[in-house]
Amino acid sequence: MKLKSLALTALFASAAFVGQSVCAQTLARTSALVTQADGAGGFNAHFGDTFAAATSGNTFSDVFTFNVGNSFDSAASLTSSYLNTSLTKDLLITGFSLYKYDPASMNILGNAIAGVNNTLPGTHPTDSWSLSAFGLTGGSYALKVDGRVVGSGGGAFGGDLAIAPVPEPETYGMLLAGLGVVGFLARRRKTA
């Protein structure tokens, strides 16, 4: 009799552990951005992700990688959308950042640049985030989007990245020399 109750107790205890393992998981995805030249030496890229209804309750961490050869300035924006109903927020974006990383080890180099949450107050607003970074050096970079799928219909987010080259120091020297020549000619005309 004692053996039966001991076995039954062990069965219930193991069932409790099995029940705890069925919890929300983190969905992690990494993909390279497809860039398009903008005709002015920089480039643009679009990024995003869609989550099925079965992922409701899960958190996510999406990483979008890109490489830049020279110094650059960047700006990015991110919004979420309603998939299931316009009355219930489907995604909750909790973080948006840009960082430089080592492609061999995937380690972050230096500090990440955090995005700004521009989401308006109210009931179930659409997420809106922005990010700006200036004077960054060339190398491998990544945009990271963190969040949680809260709607019963899944969810989606999308964003844009714009990269503009930073002028080389020689360009500033030529600019100053040109302004000096213009100033000299203007002064010469005034005295003549």
Segments (PLM) and residue ranges:
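Mature extracellular "passenger" or substrate-interacting domains of secreted, surface-exposed proteins
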Residues: Q25-P165
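Short, threonine-centered small-residue motifs that mark membrane-proximal processing/anchoring sites
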Residues: K2-T26, G158-A186, T191-A192
